[in-house]
Swiss-Prot record:
Keywords: Endoplasmic reticulum, Hydrolase, Membrane, Metal-binding, Metalloprotease, Protease, Transmembrane, Transmembrane helix, Zinc
GO biological process: CAAX-box protein processing; post-translational protein targeting to membrane, translocation
EC number: 3.4.24.84
Membrane topology: Multi-pass membrane protein
Record's protein name: Probable CAAX prenyl protease 1
InterPro entries hit by this protein: CAXX_Prtase_1, Peptidase_M48, Peptidase_M48_N
Organism: Schizosaccharomyces pombe (strain 972 / ATCC 24843)
Length: 474
């Protein structure tokens, strides 16, 4: 039956019902659209391999194009006029050299990654990995009883995903080592050791494997149990898992990598507590973490449930900034909370995840997609999700512009909030110092910024808070 006839049949059933509900009509529309999408996308013999390989090559070419546009900005001799008196020219040239090194290294890594991806596509790497991770006992157990069939499917999917993740991490190790112990070391950022590097890698693989097993297991179970009606159940699971992860990450996961120490009593702690109290921020915990064990880069963030918040400061941030600068930076961070930016971003994320699940529903039964990648007899849902993600590449790239635009708007608003609190000059000083300490470039191509940057560039942020005027007046 064609999608159109199926849709008409569903309409006739609803019309025959004495009291049709809004929900049933919505479901009808949803299923009609899904059936239509399934029909359009599932074309026998459609060259999905060529299409997805083309998307990968296109993404690679796009990244190269943007990096090429940025090159002239990395060859400039002097900093922007607004920063001329704040930035040492030797430090400025060092920052540009650091950016150039990272840019060419990123090109090498992305070239290697593209080559691996194309080889996996050409030689049916996913199908091969699926077959070798299917141990004989799985088939025997599934055949012995129907109640074991779902369990073996979940186990197989988890083993497959762990194998894929392990492969991806292992082939990236040489690049990670070079980035950490050559590039970061060259510019004075690296404080890590080979021992710390290996321990962190093992922790990441172990923790990642555990979390991934939970996510994959729940996802496969939902799709197996609810079939084509999985969307809302999977979306609900995504929301619940995200909330749990946000809650436990600072207290259970991050302490595996960093030592959390309560900020000692003193002037800084008192000022932070007074700032939090002035805007009714429910501050319960205030920590400093030993980020300097791995790097000299700095950061700060807040976390927690709406009624129980904590603030985390990198020790590098505390060490390198004056107290007024630290308070101004935290004024910016708390501005995100005050204006509900996290909530807004969460709602956007949940909305996009629902949209992606709706699109995925049109791919999940796509025979031509699975067949193109040599999945003839089996159509694992976890593989379908991976292939769907690859097919969604161009849309994801387009959405990156929108998400970064929203993020930059939030950053401007948080800066304005700190300015309203009277911290504009100190915030400007702090931002300049952060960029100086992190050897961040000061000028960027506009298209490059639109695609890659979730934060406005420094010059634009300083202009937005009238930093130059405030500096002259002081």
């Amino acid at each position: 039956m064609s999608p159109g006839l199926c849709f008409l049949k569903e309409i006739s059933v609803i019309q025959a019902t004495p009291k049709p509900t809004t929900r049933s009509f919505a479901n009808c529309c949803k299923m009609g659209i899904l059936q239509h999408l399934m029909h359009i996308l599932d074309i026998p013999g459609f060259p999905w391999k060529i299409v997805i390989a083309g998307f990968s090559i296109g993404k690679y070419a796009w990244d190269l194009y943007l990096r090429r546009r940025q090159v002239p900005y990395l060859l400039r001799e002097k900093p922007p006029a607004i920063l001329a008196e704040h930035v040492d020219e030797k430090k400025y040239q060092k920052a540009l050299s650091y950016a150039r090194d990272k840019s060419w290294f990123s090109t090498i890594v992305s070239t290697f990654t593209l080559a691996v991806d194309l080889l996996i596509i050409k030689y049916d790497g996913l199908s091969y990995l699926w077959n070798i991770t299917k141990f004989p006992w799985m088939d025997k157990l599934a055949a012995s009883s129907s109640r074991f069939s779902l369990s073996t499917s979940i186990t197989h999917s988890c083993v497959f995903m762990f194998g894929l993740t392990l492969f991806s991490r292992l082939i990236q190790i040489p690049f990670n080592l070079y980035s950490t112990f050559v590039i970061e070391e060259k510019y004075g950022f690296n404080k890590s050791t080979l021992k710390i590097f290996v321990i962190d890698l093992l922790k990441e693989l172990s923790l990642g494997g555990l979390l991934m097993s939970v996510v994959v297991g729940v996802f496969v179970k939902i799709l197996t149990k609810f079939g084509d009606n999985f969307i809302m159940y999977a979306w609900g699971a995504y929301i619940v898992f995200g909330l749990i992860l946000q809650t436990i990450a600072p207290s259970l996961i991050m302490p595996l990598f960093y030592k959390f120490t309560p900020l000692e009593n003193g002037s800084l702690r008192t000022q932070i507590e007074e700032l939090a109290a002035s805007i009714n921020f429910p501050l319960k915990k205030l920590y400093v973490i030993d980020a300097s064990r791995r790097s000299t880069h700095s950061n700060a963030f807040f976390y927690g449930l709406p009624w129980n918040k904590g603030i985390v400061l990198f020790d590098t941030l505390v060490k390198n900034h004056t107290e007024p600068e630290l308070i101004a930076i935290l004024g910016h961070e708390l501005g995100h909370w005050y204006m509900s930016h996290n909530l807004i971003n969460t709602i956007i994320d949940y909305g996009m995840s629902l949209f992606h699940l709706f699109l995925f529903a049109a791919f999940i039964r796509n025979n031509s997609l699975y067949t193109s990648f040599n999945f003839i007899t089996e159509k694992p849902v976890i593989v379908g999700l991976l292939l769907f993600s690859d097919a969604l590449g161009p849309l994801s790239s387009i959405l990156t512009f929108a998400s970064n635009k929203v993020s930059r708007l939030c950053e401007y608003q948080a800066d304005a909030f700190a300015k309203q609190l009277g911290y504009a000059k100190d915030l400007g000083d702090g931002l300049i110092r952060i960029h100086d300490d992190n050897l961040s470039p000061l000028e960027f191509d506009s298209l490059y910024t639109s695609y890659y940057h979730s934060h406005p560039i420094l010059v634009d942020r300083l202009n937005a808070i009238d930093y130059t005027t405030l500096k002259k007046n002081n």
